[in-house]
């Protein structure tokens, strides 16, 4: 498993299917500004100018919304994952 550094987060995108009121399936990521992802690993955080460590706002296992197109796709064994900065994460889904 990869261990992200600093404020980086390793995620795996979740395929979602959206339906309109009429029951038609819409093309998921083609029109959305965000994508849903599962957090697989989180870095230790980022240091301020005074050296204090600011802990990340997300945790392993969280479901998050990420800006579409953000991050770097890498392979971890046979699995494709994406490394993003915490600032690319828009919200945590509760």
Curated annotation (Swiss-Prot):
The record's InterPro entries line, in alphabetical order, gives:
Chaperonin_GroES (IPR020818), Chaperonin_GroES_sf (IPR037124), Chaprnonin_Cpn10_CS (IPR018369), GroES-like_sf (IPR011032)
Q: Which UniProt keywords apply?
A: Chaperone, Cytoplasm
Q: Which Pfam families match?
A: Cpn10 (PF00166)
* Example GO molecular function: protein-folding chaperone binding
Q: What is its main location?
A: cytoplasm
What Gene3D superfamilies does the entry give? GroES chaperonin
Keyword Cell division listed: no
Record PROSITE patterns? CHAPERONINS_CPN10 (PS00681)
The UniProt record lists the keyword Secreted = no
Q: Where in the cell is it found?
A: Cytoplasm
Q: Name one GO cellular component term.
A: cytoplasm
Any GO BP: chaperone cofactor-dependent protein refolding
Briefly state the protein's biological role.
Answer: Together with the chaperonin GroEL, plays an essential role in assisting protein folding. The GroEL-GroES system forms a nano-cage that allows encapsulation of the non-native substrate proteins and provides a physical environment optimized to promote and accelerate protein folding. GroES binds to the apical surface of the GroEL ring, thereby capping the opening of the GroEL channel.
User: Family assignment?
Assistant: Belongs to the GroES chaperonin family.
Q: How does it assemble?
A: Heptamer of 7 subunits arranged in a ring. Interacts with the chaperonin GroEL.
Q: What name appears for this protein in its UniProt entry?
A: Co-chaperonin GroES
Organism of origin = Streptococcus agalactiae serotype V (strain ATCC BAA-611 / 2603 V/R)
Gene giving rise to this polypeptide: groES
């Amino acid at each position: 498993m990869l261990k992200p550094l600093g404020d980086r987060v390793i995620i795996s995108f979740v395929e979602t299917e959206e339906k309109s009121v009429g029951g038609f399936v819409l093309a998921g990521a083609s029109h959305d500004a965000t994508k849903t992802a599962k957090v697989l690993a989180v870095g230790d955080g980022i240091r301020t100018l005074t050296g204090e460590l600011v802990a990340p706002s997300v945790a392993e296992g969280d479901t998050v919304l990420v800006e579409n197109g953000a991050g770097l796709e890498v392979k971890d064994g046979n699995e494709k994952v994406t490394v993003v900065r915490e600032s690319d994460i828009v919200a945590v889904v509760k």
